[in-house]
């Protein structure tokens, strides 16, 4: 997700976030934010104690979404929103501490973040990777770590349909899908691919 620098600066001025996770160099060095963690090409920045101003004590997160218009918007989520959503998904999917998932969606995407939240909440395992689903190393890691659940949008499943002629890793127990309607032919093909190793 690319964001205009002027727009980003304005968001920071308005919301004064305690933490910012961004690409290195996206936020110019200043006295308000210090880098506390570096991972590959990303930085986690923490706001210094100066000028901390609480806008809304319930506000936890601003998530970017393009919605139906294609123009970026930010949705405010409270601690209660995130907590309720996390617990409802856990209850519905029966996610347990023994579960193992893999990052296949961007963490800046609501669905990708909910996969992280739900698994962390129950003490499950999350396999973090920068490998793309089209890389053999992604599927090797999937098998080696015995990943048992996978989350994706229709595009992820269209990739699986194209590259998984031999079937999916035998450790896979279930998948979840969001982010748009999947056509019936793709659903049928994914089920058939899943059955090959069962």
Where are these regions (language model features)?
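Conserved ATP-binding loop and adjacent catalytic segment of the adenylate-forming AMP-binding
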Residues: 127-129, 150, 188, 192-198
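Conserved AMP-binding/adenylation subdomain of ANL enzymes
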Residues: 83-100, 110-149
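Adenylate-forming
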Residues: 22-27, 145-189
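Flexible, low-complexity linker/hinge segments
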Residues: 36-59
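Phosphate-coordination loops involved in phosphoryl transfer and adenosine-cofactor binding
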Residues: 56, 97-98, 172
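Conserved S/T- and glycine-rich ATP-binding loop of Class I adenylate-forming
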Residues: 59, 65-68, 101, 107, ...
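ATP-dependent adenylate-forming carboxylate-activation enzymes
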Residues: 1-10, 24-26, 124-145, 155-156, ...
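Conserved AMP-binding A3 loop
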Residues: 60-87
């Amino acid at each position: 997700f690319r964001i205009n620098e002027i727009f980003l600066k304005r968001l920071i001025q308005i919301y004064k976030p305690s933490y910012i996770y961004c690409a290195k160099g996206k936020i110019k060095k200043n006295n308000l934010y210090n880098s506390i963690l570096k991972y590959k090409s990303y930085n986690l920045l923490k706001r210094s104690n100066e000028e901390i101003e609480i806008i809304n004590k319930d506000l936890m997160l601003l998530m970017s979404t393009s919605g139906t218009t294609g123009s970026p918007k930010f949705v405010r989520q409270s601690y209660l929103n995130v907590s309720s959503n996390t617990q409802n998904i856990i209850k519905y999917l029966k996610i347990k501490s023994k579960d193992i998932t893999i990052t296949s969606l961007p963490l800046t995407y609501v669905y990708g973040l909910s996969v992280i939240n739900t698994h962390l909440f129950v003490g499950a395992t999350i396999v973090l990777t920068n490998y793309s689903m089209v890389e053999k190393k992604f599927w090797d890691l999937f098998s080696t770590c015995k990943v048992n659940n996978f989350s994706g949008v229709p595009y992820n499943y269209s990739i699986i349909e194209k590259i998984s002629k031999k079937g999916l890793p035998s450790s896979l127990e279930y998948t979840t899908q969001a982010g748009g309607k999947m056509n019936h032919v793709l659903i049928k093909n994914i089920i058939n691919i899943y059955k090959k190793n069962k």
